[in-house]
């Protein structure tokens, strides 16, 4: 009971301080200062006080770590300061290259024949978790968000409050008006094992690795589920207002990264203890070698080390590229490799009929994941590996994500082992497989193949095509397996009563799907063309073709009778022209188009599209023949808006960078496309430069 000499507000404040300090000692310092029974008694006392008087409830109360109803979803929020990713180095040479570039940028003299100049660095472990941005106002946690695209993330404050190692109130007497902390949420290995054991007992599928489990947990709508998984957090970056200086009883403002880590620890955060102050490049290399060897002894997953310039003022001088700070780099561990016994070769059939060989082998742990399958890409790769039954193969996770077979230990091959060859018949429909002389891919050419049909349907309803919400892979599989759908057109003849009888289809979802199918009939002609899934015709080419040929009829006539009209379209070559000719000349496809027309799908540009194209053609075309690639998040333009502006001026937007790319338009958190552009010396524009180019 609250002592009579202390008012409820004072007692509540006292309890908050006692409980928060006890939690900090237990979860952050790992030095318990309060017995569990005492903590529970004080916690209940605070809970009772807050229940009697809601005005005593504050955001930093320990009772607010878990509570509230499950969320309906997560709002997108803009980061005060962009949460950028880091550039990667995969070997010492790439690390040295980064170090030399940074030294030159900072005005240090460099010479390949002499030792590199000394730059004070801080080495930190790269925790394999999920980056978080924590926002504090006047010392109280007011928002937590995921990285997202670097400029905007998802607001997950209720979930992050459940992480005991994240303080709800900072240990500062005079906190700044705002403060930003960045760090990594993660699930320790032992906790991850316990989670998967519990999931196994419930019959749930096990998480593949701690990182995936952490990401999925942070996006749970119910904070109680998040709390049950006991996430942890290491802080590693601090942002303070430029004019803020510490007052009495608070630690001085840090002037370098090493001091910033100590400052974060002093105000209540958990900081990874395995950091080091590194005097020069040799020290950086030694730090990496140490943890490359010892990382498996750690109680959490790490996929490399992060090296940061120590001096914060020099960090500011070095600045940022479009997607990453110049003053930091992540040095990644080499991809893990492991041997396993090959069990069999199987095949997967894609939408175009392409057959992808897959190696199935005894499950092995690899880079935190259990792996038992890896793609072999095509028949050429199978021949190169010369796979035999019972072979011991070497599997690697490329970029620690995608499993691939990189070799065979022939000295371990069993006596009398038989050469493994790809099947000559389709595993789905038992039709003969075909391989063209100039192609590496083997294909099923049976248009009625269930695998091709499933892929065709998925493509037709995909976001880039007709965008039919509610028609997912599971429902498509049911419809195909039951023989209810044999073509795209059959989707539009499905009755509500039939759809409602499918697994997980209620009356509401059925009604929504019927509405979505009807709405898809009026989608633009270029989306319909792309949705047909004609080999080699992607979104960009479909848009260009639809602009030149305003209907399926005019396109078919040109494809079959005047292919030179097809190749006159910018970006369309002989390969696409031949593919169009073959597609439109196929009787089954002609029947499909006729049936779609009968069902109300126009397969031609409507008046608005024609008017838009006419308006564009009347403009002065300034970017004819220029190709663009968009990457990252632009300040005010969405990607679709930027693409529309470029295309309105006669330019073309592609998805990948090549030596033929004219410009790469890069925003915040630009990815590998920017790296490739710099390597190929392609001109890189920001949004302002793009708009100037368009205006000219």
UniProtKB/Swiss-Prot annotation:
Every BRCT domain range: 618-696
Keywords on record: DNA damage, DNA repair, DNA replication, Ligase, Magnesium, Manganese, Metal-binding, NAD, Zinc
Matches recorded under SUPFAM superfamilies: BRCT domain, DNA ligase/mRNA capping enzyme, catalytic domain, Nucleic acid-binding proteins, RuvA domain 2-like
Alphabetized InterPro entries for the sequence: BRCT_dom, BRCT_dom_sf, DisA/LigA_HHH, DNA_ligase, DNAligase_adenylation, DNAligase_N, NA-bd_OB-fold, NAD_DNA_ligase_OB
Binding site for Zn(2+): 426, 429, 444, 449
Active-site residues (renumbered): 126 (n6-amp-lysine intermediate)
Cofactor(s) the protein needs: Mg(2+); Mn(2+)
Gene Ontology annotations of biological process type: DNA repair; DNA replication
Binding-site positions, NAD(+): 36-40, 85-86, 124, 147, 184, 308, 332
Pfam families in the cross-refs: BRCT, DNA_ligase_aden, DNA_ligase_OB, DNA_ligase_ZBD, HHH_2, HHH_5
Catalyzed reactions per annotation: NAD(+) + (deoxyribonucleotide)n-3'-hydroxyl + 5'-phospho-(deoxyribonucleotide)m = (deoxyribonucleotide)n+m + AMP + beta-nicotinamide D-nucleotide
Gene Ontology CC terms: cytosol
Protein purpose: DNA ligase that catalyzes the formation of phosphodiester linkages between 5'-phosphoryl and 3'-hydroxyl groups in double-stranded DNA using NAD as a coenzyme and as the energy source for the reaction. It is essential for DNA replication and repair of damaged DNA.
The protein's name in its UniProt record: DNA ligase
Naturally occurring in which organism (per UniProt): Prochlorococcus marinus (strain MIT 9313)
Recorded name of the encoding gene: ligA
């Amino acid at each position: 009971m609250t002592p009579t000499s202390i008012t409820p507000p004072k007692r509540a404040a006292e309890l908050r301080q006692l409980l928060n300090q006890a939690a900090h000692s237990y979860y952050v310092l790992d030095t318990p200062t309060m017995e569990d029974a005492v903590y529970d008694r004080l916690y209940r006392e605070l809970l009772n006080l807050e229940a009697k008087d809601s005005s005593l409830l504050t955001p930093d109360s320990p009772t607010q770590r878990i509570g509230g109803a499950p969320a309906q979803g997560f709002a997108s929020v803009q980061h005060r300061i962009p949460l950028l990713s880091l550039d990667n180095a995969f070997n010492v040479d790439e690390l040295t290259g980064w170090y030399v570039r940074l030294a030159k940028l900072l005005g240090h003299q460099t010479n390949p024949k002499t030792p590199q100049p000394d730059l004070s660095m801080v080495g930190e472990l790269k925790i394999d978790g999920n980056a978080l941005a924590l926002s504090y106002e006047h010392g109280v946690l007011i928002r937590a968000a995921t990285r997202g695209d670097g400029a905007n993330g998802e607001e997950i404050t209720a979930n992050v409050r459940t992480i005991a190692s994240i303080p709800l109130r900072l240990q500062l007497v005079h906190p700044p008006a705002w403060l930003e902390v960045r760090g990594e949420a993660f699930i320790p290995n032992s906790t991850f094992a316990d989670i998967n054991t519990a999931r196994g007992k419930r019959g749930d599928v096990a998480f593949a690795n701690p990182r995936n489990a952490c990401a999925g947990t942070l996006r749970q709508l119910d904070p109680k589920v998040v709390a049950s998984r006991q996430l942890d957090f290491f802080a590693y970056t601090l942002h303070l207002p430029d004019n803020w200086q510490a007052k009495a009883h608070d630690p001085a403002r840090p002037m370098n990264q090493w001091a910033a880590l100590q400052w974060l620890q002093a105000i209540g955060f958990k900081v990874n203890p395995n950091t080091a102050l590194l005097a020069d490049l040799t020290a950086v290399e030694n730090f990496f070698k140490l943890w490359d060897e010892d990382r498996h002894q750690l109680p959490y997953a790490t996929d490399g080390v992060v090296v940061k310039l120590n001096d914060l003022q020099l960090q500011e001088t070095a600045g940022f590229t479009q997607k990453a700070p110049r003053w930091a780099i992540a040095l990644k561990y080499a991809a893990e490799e492991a041997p396993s016994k090959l069990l069999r070769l199987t095949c997967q059939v894609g939408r175009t009929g392409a057959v992808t060989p897959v190696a199935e082998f005894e499950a092995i742990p690899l880079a935190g994941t259990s792996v038992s399958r890896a793609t072999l890409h095509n028949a050429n790769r199978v021949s190169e590996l010369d796979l035999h039954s019972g072979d011991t193969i070497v599997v690697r996770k490329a970029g620690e994500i995608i499993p691939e077979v990189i070799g065979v230990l022939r000295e371990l091959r069993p006596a009398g082992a038989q050469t493994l060859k790809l099947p000559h018949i389709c595993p789905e429909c038992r039709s003969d497989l075909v391989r063209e002389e100039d192609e590496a891919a083997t294909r099923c050419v049976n248009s009625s193949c269930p695998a091709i049909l499933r892929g065709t349907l998925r493509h037709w309803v995909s976001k880039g095509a007709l965008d039919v919400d509610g028609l997912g892979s599971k429902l498509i599989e049911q419809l195909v397996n039951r023989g209810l759908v044999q073509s795209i057109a059959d989707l539009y003849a499905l009755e509500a009563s039939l759809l409602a009888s499918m697994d997980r289809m209620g009356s509401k979802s059925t009604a929504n799907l019927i509405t979505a199918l009807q709405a898809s009939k009026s989608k633009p002609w270029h989306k319909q063309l792309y949705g047909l899934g004609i080999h080699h015709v992607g979104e960009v080419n479909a848009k260009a073709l639809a602009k030149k040929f305003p209907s399926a009829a005019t396109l078919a006539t040109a494809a079959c009778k005047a292919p030179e009209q097809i190749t006159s379209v910018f970006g369309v070559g002989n390969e696409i022209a031949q593919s169009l000719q073959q597609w439109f000349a196929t009787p089954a496809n002609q029947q499909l188009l006729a049936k779609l027309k009968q069902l109300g799908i126009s397969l031609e540009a409507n008046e608005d599209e024609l008017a838009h194209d006419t308006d564009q053609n009347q403009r002065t075309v300034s970017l004819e023949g220029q190709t663009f690639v968009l990457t990252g998040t632009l300040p005010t333009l969405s990607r679709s808006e930027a693409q529309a502006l470029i295309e309105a001026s006669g330019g073309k937007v592609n998805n990948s960078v090549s030596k033929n790319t004219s410009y790469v338009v890069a925003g915040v958190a630009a990815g590998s496309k920017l790296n490739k552009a710099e390597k190929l010396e392609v001109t890189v524009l920001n949004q302002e430069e793009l708009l100037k180019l368009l205006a000219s």
